[in-house]
Structure formats: structure tokens, C-alpha cells
């Protein structure tokens, strides 16, 4: 990770045409707990894995309410996410006050992109170390957007960010053709299955470590936590076990139990 003089500030380019401070901020997103977003023709769903700093601490909130038609899930620095969430709430309030209408989701994402681009260009600033999945519903239908510390943003049919998110993205790519025709219950189950792929073999989803956000046609953005998640988890089949060779069947569980969870 030694970059010599090329990672001292966000305004310094390396000879390879890279800005290392932005790449470091992208790594912060990969250290956050995983979150998944996906949509059908009528709904957009966010599913996030909550993490507790210690056994004495409560689980951190991973899904935040922005407006009646928009919510976000986060991966990365929570403090940066809180600041961006407050900015988004203010923009939504301004739209309702000035224009008497909800702010279109794509317009809000564009404003976030403009705000997060500023610290990637100015001396003495650092990029926001958080990635967002934005779920919303407007006149154009349901939306899932991804934003990055580099100020890029993408309109997605499904996406996952955070630690071990590649496993979730593999699941989403494999089942992406099914999402558009799913009803709400099936869509949430797909999100939970994708999120479960990010966990080690010895762990599973529970009401304590999962949060769900749903928005759709005639449905305001709603967050489900703790016991409210139970109906969705109850309908989820058990996690399939990895196949092992007969001679190693007794040894492998002990070996896998020692594998640390990626942070």
C-alpha cells in the first residue's frame, strides 16, 4: 500500500493516471457490512446486514429513511453516511416546499453525485468513505441506484456492496431474469438469499442482524427491524450446506469454524 508521494493528497495524480486517495475511500466501502438492493416492476427492496461493535453495543442501523418515497442503505463510514442522508432529506424537503411535489429519484442521485465530487477535486479535502444503495419509487417506477466515493453513480436492476459482496452479486446475476416478474414476498426472499451468501458457512441470518427496507407503488418507504423481519425469515428455506468429501467430513467443520469473517 506504499504509494510514495502520489497518495499525499486527493489532487495528486500518479503516473498511471490514478488518484490513490479515491481508491482508499473505495476500500472503506469494501470494509463495511454487506447490503443488497433489487427491484421488480412494482417494488424496490433493500436488505442489509447489521453489525454490532461489541456484545455490549446495539446493532448499527444500516437502512435510513430519506423521504416517503426514498430510502438508502450504507456500506462504509457511518458518520459520512449520516451527513449525506441529512443532505438528501433537506433536498427532498426543499422540493416539497418549493414545487409541492416529491423529488424525482434520479434528480436526487444527481445532486448526491455533484456533492460527493467536490472533495475529490479540492486540496485539503477527502472523499466520502461510504457507498450508498438508493431505493425509490416515482412516476418512472421503482429505482435502485448505487453511489461511490468517486462520485460515480449507476442505475441498477440489482446490486450489492460491502464486505464479501461479490458472492451476493454472483447470486443476483444468476437470478436477475426472475426479479422483474416477482411479487413483493419473492423479491424480499431473493434479497435475503443474496445477503446470506456474504456470510461465513457457520453463520446465518437472524432478526438481530438483518434489516429490510421496502418501497413501491402505493407503498411508502418502510423499514423492518428486529421482530418485524421474522415473517420474511420464516419463509426462507435453510441454507444449503457445502458438500464435503467423506474422508474429510468430520474435519472440515472444525477448520471452517476458525475462518474469520471479513470486515
UniProtKB/Swiss-Prot annotation:
Q: Compositional bias (Basic and acidic residues) spans?
A: 253-263
Q: Where is this cross-link: Glycyl lysine isopeptide (Lys-Gly) (interchain with G-Cter in ubiquitin)?
A: 115, 208
The entry's cellular-component GO terms read: centrosome; cytosol; nucleoplasm; proteasome complex; proteasome core complex; proteasome core complex, alpha-subunit complex
Q: Which positions does the record annotate as the modified residue N-acetylmethionine?
A: 1
CDD domains noted in UniProt = proteasome_alpha_type_1
Q: Where is this region: Disordered?
A: 232-263
PTM entry text = C-terminal extension is partially cleaved off by limited proteolysis leading to a conversion of the proteasome from its latent into its active form.
* The keyword Ubl conjugation belongs to this UniProt entry's keyword annotation: yes
Ribosomal protein as UniProt keyword: no
Residues annotated as glycosylated are 110
**What is any Pfam family matched here?**
Proteasome
Q: Where in the cell is it found?
A: Cytoplasm; Nucleus
Its Gene Ontology molecular function terms? lipopolysaccharide binding
Keywords recorded for this protein, A-Z: Acetylation, Cytoplasm, Glycoprotein, Immunity, Isopeptide bond, Nucleus, Phosphoprotein, Proteasome, Ubl conjugation
Q: What induces it?
A: Up-regulated in liver tumor tissues. Up-regulated by the antioxidant dithiolethione (D3T) in liver, lung and colon (at the protein level).
Q: PROSITE patterns annotated for this entry?
A: PROTEASOME_ALPHA_1, PROTEASOME_ALPHA_2
BP GO annotations: immune system process; negative regulation of inflammatory response to antigenic stimulus; ubiquitin-dependent protein catabolic process
Expression by tissue, per the entry, reads:
Detected in liver (at protein level).
Q: Which residues carry this modification: Phosphoserine?
A: 110, 177
> Per its UniProt entry, which superkingdom is the organism in?
Eukaryota
Report the SS bond pairs: none
Q: What does the record give as the function of this protein?
A: Component of the 20S core proteasome complex involved in the proteolytic degradation of most intracellular proteins. This complex plays numerous essential roles within the cell by associating with different regulatory particles. Associated with two 19S regulatory particles, forms the 26S proteasome and thus participates in the ATP-dependent degradation of ubiquitinated proteins.
Subunit field text? The 26S proteasome consists of a 20S proteasome core and two 19S regulatory subunits. The 20S proteasome core is a barrel-shaped complex made of 28 subunits that are arranged in four stacked rings. The two outer rings are each formed by seven alpha subunits, and the two inner rings are formed by seven beta subunits. The proteolytic activity is exerted by three beta-subunits PSMB5, PSMB6 and PSMB7. Interacts with NOTCH3. Interacts with ZFAND1.
The family this protein is said to belong to: Belongs to the peptidase T1A family.
Name of the protein in its database record: Proteasome subunit alpha type-1
Q: Which organism is it from?
A: Mus musculus (Mouse)
Taxonomic classification: Eukaryota, Metazoa, Chordata, Craniata, Vertebrata
- Gene name, per UniProt, is Psma1
Amino acid at each position: 500500500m506504499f504509494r510514495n508521494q502520489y497518495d499525499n493528497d486527493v489532487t495528486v495524480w500518479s503516473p498511471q493516471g490514478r488518484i490513490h486517495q479515491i481508491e482508499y475511500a473505495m476500500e472503506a466501502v469494501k470494509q463495511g457490512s454487506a447490503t443488497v438492493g433489487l427491484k421488480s416492476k412494482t417494488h424496490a427492496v433493500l436488505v442489509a446486514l447489521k453489525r454490532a461493535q461489541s456484545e455490549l453495543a446495539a446493532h448499527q442501523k444500516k437502512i435510513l429513511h430519506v423521504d416517503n418515497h426514498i430510502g438508502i442503505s450504507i456500506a462504509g463510514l457511518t458518520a459520512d453516511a449520516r451527513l449525506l442522508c441529512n443532505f438528501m432529506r433537506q433536498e427532498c424537503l426543499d422540493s416539497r416546499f418549493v414545487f409541492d411535489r416529491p423529488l424525482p429519484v434520479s434528480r436526487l442521485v444527481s445532486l448526491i453525485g455533484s456533492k460527493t465530487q467536490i472533495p475529490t477535486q479540492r486540496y485539503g479535502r477527502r472523499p466520502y468513505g461510504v457507498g450508498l444503495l438508493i431505493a425509490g419509487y416515482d412516476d418512472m417506477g421503482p429505482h435502485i441506484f448505487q453511489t461511490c466515493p468517486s462520485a460515480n453513480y449507476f442505475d441498477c436492476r440489482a446490486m450489492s456492496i460491502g464486505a464479501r459482496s461479490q458472492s451476493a452479486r454472483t447470486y443476483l446475476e444468476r437470478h436477475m431474469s426472475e426479479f422483474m416478474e416477482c411479487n413483493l414476498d419473492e423479491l424480499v426472499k431473493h434479497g435475503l438469499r443474496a445477503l446470506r451468501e456474504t456470510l461465513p458457512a457457520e453463520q446465518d441470518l437472524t432478526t438481530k442482524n438483518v434489516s429490510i427496507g421496502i418501497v413501491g407503488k402505493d407503498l411508502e418507504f418502510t423499514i423492518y427491524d428486529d421482530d418485524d423481519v421474522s415473517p420474511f425469515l420464516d419463509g426462507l428455506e435453510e441454507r444449503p450446506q457445502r458438500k464435503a468429501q467423506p474422508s474429510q467430513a468430520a474435519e472440515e467443520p472444525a477448520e471452517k469454524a476458525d475462518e474469520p469473517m471479513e470486515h
